[in-house]
Every structure is written in structure tokens, then in C-alpha cells.
Amino acid sequence: MGTRLDALILGAGPTLANKVWEEVKDELVRLNKMLNKFDKESELYRVNNKAIHSPCSVSEELWKILADCEQYYERTYGYFDISLKDYSKVEFDNECHTVYFTDTGIQLDLGGYAKGYALESIRKILVNHSITQALINFGNSSVLALGSHPHGDSWSIGINDPYNPDKIVGNISLRDNTLSTSGNMPSHTGHIFNPFTGQYNADRRIVSVSAPNAIDAEVVSTTLMIADKIKEKEIVSQFTIDQYCIFSL
């Protein structure tokens, strides 16, 4: 998925910790082979290159993910659009589980979804092994916290200023929940753009969202980067959100 993952697992001996870590790595490799649109061997890459010519069948898991993304599209009033152009140009056949693009230029991009999905998969692995204290940091933008820090009642997560890495612009406490931070980084300014206008919101540098569900947190942090203030409140009302912060810097 083009980034690193750090895991802090507490309360487990070396044997169990290594076993859990190997399962986590295997799961990330598996998900990358399905969801990474840049990997020529991934399922999503195949869909993007075939669906413009003819209906393309997808696996059961990817089909469920795409159906989930359609629900997020509706719940965010169209601001979460994985088509990168016009979601109405993507046809889904519910009987055959196929995807077809009715216009050129359509590419499915799960960049605002995949890390949240991966964190929820990792959560299942941790829970299956009765791990109750852990901190999973995915690319310094997506975080899963189980239990609390051993010297406190929560995990305190600092939000860095991407334009001044030594500066912390905020802190969010996590306990059995997740955090997603989206932003216009110096190297990726404007990579999150409004599907209705094709423009990015220059006034919003960082958005951080904490929520019980990692996918919800990632989708909402992504959409709040581009939604106006009226839609911002409407979108947030559609989800169970613990806290969200918008930084203009």
C-alpha cells in the first residue's frame, strides 16, 4: 500500500507476538494484491484495465468492498467517490458481480478506504489472539488503538504539522478506537479533490477524525478535506464519530 506499518503489541510473550506479527504481515500482503491499483498483479489493477472494455468479474471480497464504497458515496452525499471522475459511469451487475465503466477516464481508487479496511482486518487478528493492548500505526495517518497506554488511561496521539515536522498541532486520545488524518501534504498538495468541481480545498491542510470504526474514520477525514461547512455537519451526522479536528495552519 506504499507505506509502512508499525505495531506495538503489549501483554504477549515473544512467541505469540511473533505469530501475530506474521499474520498481520501476511494479511497486508494479501490486501495489497487486491486493493493496490498501482500493482500490475493486483485485482483492482485488472479491474481498472478491463472494465473500460467489457464487464469485469470481481472476487466476493472486492465486490463487498465496492458495495460498501457505494454506501459511503451515498452517506457522504457524493463527496466520497472512488471513481475519481463520475460515479454514475460505473455500472455494477448485482447478479453477475461484474463492474463496467461506461466512459473513458474512469479509475477505481481505494486510497481513501484501504488503510481503514486493513486496520479493521488487523483488529480481527488481534482480537482472535486475545490481544487487548496494542497500538497500530499505518503510515502515520491511520491508527488503531486497543486498550490504553501502560502508564495512562488512553493512548495520546500527536498530530504533526506536515509543513513543520517538529511542530505538533494537536493531540487526540484513543482507547479502543481509531484515528485517521488526511491532508494536503507538501509533496501531495491537492491529491484530495472535490469530485463535483475537480478542485481541492486550499483552506484545509489537515483533518483528523477519531471513530470506533477505522473505515468510517478514513472516509470521513477524506471527505471533510473537501466538503463545505454545511455539508461537513451533514456528513458527520451520518456516522458515529468521537471527535474531529480541522486544521487550516
Model-found features: residue ranges?
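Mature catalytic core of soluble alpha/beta enzymes
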Residues: 1-249
